[in-house]
């Protein structure tokens, strides 16, 4: 009987230890996920905001293809991947690894040439647009776009946010939307260039002790100015028509919704009216 009581006591302590460990692990994981970016609902809302700006709908447009005459060839898919900048190429490469025999595989040599030359030429991409559109509901094609989007845009946006000391979900969503449109290159219109200009105007970043809300307001000013007067003249007309996306983001800040809670009401003459839950 004594042995049985000892065993019972052992298992009771083991159960308590396991419970404590589980609670600690869960807490650490939740904090890690938040530190790495946005939570699931915040990320969804950020992506839906960008989808409104890019495609006029809260539904992610995997099958979107259009030539915007902005110097970037075809603009495609959920993040506006383009044939001139190499991200459309990366999507097709990732997709081809998953599905070796696909409709887009034959365009890989030309996509590589266009990416290398940063060319907006689409003369040798006959049938590319229709092939891309036809794969809109393909599970692997969607997964390829999601993977490239996270690798090239979402993760870098969260890293830049961490480096700048940004804590609010809205600020991080603004960073994500900015990198989607401006890219994360080293040109004067790039995402990082805008951050550097903002830091100069604000006297530093939130990581340096600058108030995050004031810094974000400065950043939106800088981005607005860049959209109106981009260094890249090929994008000038297209970008000037997109300044309303900054107005929408600023309106969310004015509503003090820095946690990016739903519902978010988007009211825009340029993009229309939407409710993001």
UniProtKB/Swiss-Prot annotation:
Pfam families: Glyco_hydro_46. It catalyses: Endohydrolysis of beta-(1->4)-linkages between D-glucosamine residues in a partly acetylated chitosan. One of its GO terms (biological process) is carbohydrate metabolic process. Keywords: Glycosidase, Hydrolase, Secreted, Signal. One of its GO terms (cellular component) is extracellular region. The active site is at 54 (proton donor), 70 (nucleophile). GO terms for molecular function: chitosanase activity. It is found in: Secreted. This is Chitosanase. The lineage of its organism: Bacteria, Bacillati, Bacillota, Bacilli, Bacillales.
